[in-house]
């Protein structure tokens, strides 16, 4: 492309301070160095993780930064040594890297990758420990190794999944975070079996993806738990077949679920990020075999607790990141499943706005009616 090797000036939404409106700026995006890829972002969605960092509660939150980690675009150029993608490829940037070489990747036990974490966790690139973004000569931090609230971004090549060029980018951008996180929590982390009873705490995008995953896994009872009863109607479309509002009961929700399920559920999923709910999710599991998966991200410094007897008597407490999916290997597979109509994606998109309307999009995110808002970055 004509821009290869040059600094690109483009529009991006910059977070200068926690909880202050994002500012649409002309940002300079440097060319990719060795092992890096510059991507033209076409569509990006908002996730509660973006809002979490923007709130100032994230211990790794750095300002000023360009947020965003759920997106899709086209490779503009690549740095030296990059062989798996080239200019023109359709891609999804992945906050969960996959180098296939580090001890994590080689272990066969996890989808975590250690290659670039020391850089992405502090908002910079590995090569020179610097940012590729600047405004008027002042550096702007990266976010989660993706920074997709920008018309162009630079990412490590181990964080890029090449996808089917016929897939609609305004839809499959969701496969960069929330939907795989929920599906994978069921398929990879919990390994839910047919006939299982499942409880899902929190019916946002991730919770609904858990429901979809549980339904396709053959779960029989899929119990949705949320303090907003209006969410049940939508949740039914994703597989939830029972609903409980904790506000309707005068005893702890774990006791309600245990009574409802003859001793507890086989699997529970906490999709909120609330440590007291995490405890309830564990304690509503059946003695002897119940497994609870923590999916939601709690605020910095918060701790989980329960009585050890809960674990001694056979319950298992697990966590998951990106649903246990290997990003570069399995995101393309998820795109194919979507193209074959084997998983939902469109149904999670409730709003479509432009990059210039990003602050409105964050307002919508905090309203119960918004699941995913997709932004067209060209406007």
Swiss-Prot record:
Q: Which residues carry this modification: N-acetylalanine?
A: 2
**Catalytic activity annotation:** a primary alcohol + NAD(+) = an aldehyde + NADH + H(+); a secondary alcohol + NAD(+) = a ketone + NADH + H(+); S-(hydroxymethyl)glutathione + NADP(+) = S-formylglutathione + NADPH + H(+); S-(hydroxymethyl)glutathione + NAD(+) = S-formylglutathione + NADH + H(+)
Its Gene Ontology cellular component terms are: cytoplasm
* Residues at which Zn(2+) 2 binds: 99, 102, 105, 113
GO molecular function per UniProt: alcohol dehydrogenase (NAD+) activity; S-(hydroxymethyl)glutathione dehydrogenase (NAD+) activity; S-(hydroxymethyl)glutathione dehydrogenase (NADP+) activity; S-nitrosoglutathione reductase (NADH) activity; zinc ion binding
Q: What superkingdom does the record give?
A: Eukaryota
Tell me what turns on expression of this protein: Down-regulated by wounding and activated by salicylic acid (SA).
Bound cofactor: record note: Binds 2 Zn(2+) ions per subunit.
* Residue ranges of coiled coil: none
PROSITE patterns found in the cross-reference section: ADH_ZINC (PS00059)
Q: Identify the main location.
A: cytoplasm
Span-the-membrane segments of this chain are none
Q: Which Gene3D superfamilies match?
A: Medium-chain alcohol dehydrogenases, catalytic domain, NAD(P)-binding Rossmann-like Domain
How activity is controlled: the entry says: Repressed by thiol-modifying agents N-ethylmaleimide (NEM) and 5,5-dithio-bis-(2-nitrobenzoic acid) (DTNB), as well as by methyl methanethiosulfonate (MMTS) in a dose-dependent manner. Inhibited by hydrogen peroxide H(2)O(2).
Task: Give its E.C. classification number.
Answer: 1.1.1.1, 1.1.1.-, 1.1.1.284
Keywords, comma-separated and alphabetical:
Acetylation, Cytoplasm, Metal-binding, NAD, Oxidoreductase, Zinc
Q: Does the keyword Cytoplasm apply?
A: yes
The residues the record assigns to binding NAD(+) are 48, 202-207, 226, 231, 272, 295-297, 320-322, 372
Noted pH dependence of activity = Optimum pH is 7.9-9.
Give the binding site residues for an alcohol: 49, 69
What GO terms describe the biological role, i.e. biological process, of this protein?
A: formaldehyde catabolic process
Q: Which residues bind Zn(2+) 1?
A: 47, 69-70, 177
Q: How does it assemble?
A: Homodimer.
Q: Which family is annotated?
A: Belongs to the zinc-containing alcohol dehydrogenase family. Class-III subfamily.
NCBIfam families referenced in this protein's UniProt entry, alphabetically: adh_III_F_hyde
The protein depicted here goes by the name: Alcohol dehydrogenase class-3
User: What's the encoding gene here?
Assistant: ADH2
